[in-house]
Amino acid sequence: MTLVSQATPSGRTGASPAFLRKIVVDPWLFGIFAVVTLSVLVFAALPIFTVLKQAVVTDRGFDLAALAEVLTKSFVWESLFNTLLLGATSAVIATLTGFVLAFSATRTTMPGKTFVHGVALLPIISPPFVMALAVVILFGRSGLITRELLGIRNANVYGFHSLVLIQSLAFTPIAYLNIRGMLQSIDSALEDASASLGASRWITFSRVTLPLVTPAILSSALLVFVKSVEDFGNPMLIGGNFNTLAVEAYSQMVGYFDLHSGALLASLMLVPSITAFLVHRYWVAKRSYVTVTGKPTAQTIRISGAAVVLPLSMLCYAIVLAILLFYLTVIYVSFTRLPGIDNTLTTDHYATVFTAGFQTLTNSLLLAGIATPVTAVAGMLIAYLLVRKAFPGSFLLRWGTLLSFAAPGTILGIGYVSTFNAPPLLLTGTAFIVVAAMVVKNLQVGIEAGSNQLRQIDKSIEEASMTLGASNTRTFFQITLPLLKPALFTSLSYAFTRSLTTLSAVIFLVSANWTLITVTILSQVETLKIGVAAAYCSILVFVVLAILALMQLLLSSTSPKR
Amino acid sequence: MSKVIFSNISKRFPGVSGAAAGLAVDRLNLVIEEGTLVTLLGPSGCGKTTTLRMLAGFETPSEGAITIGGRDVTNVPVNARNVGMVFQSYALFPHMTVRENVEYGVRLLNLPRHEMKDRVSSVLATMALETYADRSPSRLSGGQQQRVALARAVVTQPKVLLFDEPLSNLDAQLRERMRDELRAIQLRLGITSLYVTHDQSEAMAISDRVVVMRNGVIEQDDTPLNVYSRPGTGFVAEFMGKANILQGRVEKLDESTVSIRIASTVAFTLPRGNRAFRPGEQVRCVVRPEHIRVDANGAMQAKVRRVVFQGAYVEYLTDLEGQECVFLDSDYYRTGVAEVGQMLRLSVDSQPVWILPHNEAADMGKAA
């Protein structure tokens, strides 16, 4: 500490630039900042740029002809169109269902809200393709509903219609949580004021409530769109001939070893994703009238008229029961010998999972277990560096992490394979590269949660620590990090769930040594071992639920005594 | 030993437009004598908080140097300055108990364990916090939280103690009590202190010197008594409580007194001290409302414009031949309350009347 004061002797200070002083005042923290920023650039920005480069550069250098050639191929345009169509359709439907659920849960006297809430969140904590599996089981050629119940012999479950159904249900929780948060944070006095001015329920809804939640509705639609574009598992399993960019890029890469086309398709995915993301960040977010603090305001007027509540409740229960049906089907099938053909109950599939498949299960848990704390602590640290310390070069960190979040997993996965396949960064086939992908892909949620929380922590609490003689680094670990605990837990839960259930990026990275449960499930489905796949899915959902419950318990037991 | 000197300190905030293009503090010179408490007083945006934060080390001056006890600290980081600070929001660490809060800074000193314990318990005793030592700060009252904040700030035996509007979160009664408590402890410990507030009565009650600031510049640096009764500028006069600044003319001059005419009457005659006046010269007189009273034989005549009943007194806003004049009548129960539109005869207690220096800018240097 005294060293620092000697290093920059007194006197006229105008000469030494302000940003240099920031570094000198806390060299440790700047060191951390430099390492974090460099890591983000290498593991987030570099792979994406590698893919972009591969899309336009061949052996002959910058190759417009090769680019033009790929662009004339019909599968490029078809898959781009398919992706956009699917994304837009799913976004609209998922947002609508999310709104219905959120409105019913916050503004009506619908019975069984806790049940509806719990089930509506299920899809968020399970692998994205559990739904696809369930749909195949229920509506496939030998489907429980199509064949057993309805006797249809040649049902075609594969294609656009199934994808829309699955994605809409799978992404409803995103819209539901988003819109619910905003509905809850609207000051109920606004709706009361409208009523007191003589407005009917409908007028209040359409002129006050709806305009106030419009930003949340738009933002939900954009987020679902991004998720749909990124989704790999569902289109892969159930798309049939309806190929999206993610699937097409994968099959070009892995099926035809066509790196150039694969890179171009993955690059194309960036366009809708980044556009939607930027619109969300710089347009929708700025139009928000309400700050979502997560703190519900006073009780709002509940709509109790049967004419409104009954149809809404029926709709909600239909959605929730559909979700529940899908999950129960998967569990049922995991205990069925040969679904649709031999429906005797058995635990054979679980036996398979715990013997032959045990390795992949422990792999997944181990790698996700490593990635989770790294993601969460790094997220808090980055939030702190960005919100509290504006080091020179902060923008690199900010944009690096945003890019990794907005970029679909496919481009990240392809980028990793292409970037880290030669020294000095020869990482392909290692566990490290899988963990890196998990961390990078899930970092942003922790950063957002951490930043929001930091902005609510009085800055003078940290300043007090400094006046008492603590360095920036010590202040972060002893004062800031403990105060960020809620955000830390949000980030831990999210990172764990996502790391365990991710597919789109890691499918390019797994190796014989390090295979993951999600990849295994996919290959089980492809080889029609539906029962084993269902057993894996059930275990995965159970593990995630158990770990989340454990974390919740830990959080509440370590909360400050009142 | 820990005298604080600001020499020629300026602070520019880049990208801030408006008043003097982001110049928050403009060539400020200030000395805080060892063991004294100096208050920076002024409206928001006057640069007082920036000045305090520069002494703490949160802001770095754009120009100039700051020394504490002869050591140049201009480029020393906050955590190496050995300053204690009491924050407006108290900034108590919410995840620690009262004792842990107080211990935090002492732990960083690497003292022997028993000495650390001794220091903490003696400070807790001084602040009457022993019974609350193991509570969370959120379970304490505002006044108790304030004491914890002070305990935490002084336990490391800082060279300088900084107060950033520490009482503004308390209700009026508690504020006065804590104010006296803060001052008593500061005097007892003899710590050189800088105190920032926008409350003039707080400033007068607590300080050895009051520094009134405006637009990043010191308007006056003086004892509380002088700042109140001999303001250097109209701004200071009006900022330090209510003041009538009446336009007058020098009517009569002799060796020791000067008589001032306000509008049509010679309103008062007061000792001239050693100041120079010219007959007929225009002057501005600071007359505090408490020094004007209703008097049937008074020289001045004023028309009542507004009457505000305050309990202990009645506040009148009157029109004194075209000039606004406010005064307080605490005798109303004897004389009755006048009504709007009524004419009153007033007299001025001439002893405390203060004639503002002619040229504020020229006089400012003298005052400082």
PLM regions: where:
Chain A
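Transmembrane alpha-helical segments of polytopic membrane transport and secretion proteins
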Residues: 1-35, 280-318, 552-562
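A short amphipathic helical element positioned immediately N-terminal to and/or at the very start
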Residues: 19-21, 63-71, 345-354
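Alpha-helical residues within the helix-turn-helix
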Residues: 195, 466
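Membrane-water interface segments at the C-terminal ends of transmembrane alpha-helices
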Residues: 25-60, 72-184, 208, 212-233, ...
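Juxtamembrane inter-helical linkers in multi-pass membrane proteins
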Residues: 192, 200, 287-303, 339-353
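Internal catalytic domains of large membrane-associated glycosyltransferases
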Residues: 173, 192-193, 203
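Short alpha-helical segment that forms part of, or immediately flanks, the ligand-binding pocket
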Residues: 191-192, 462-463
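Glycine-rich helix-loop "coupling/hinge" segments at transmembrane-helix boundaries
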Residues: 232-256, 341-342, 503-530
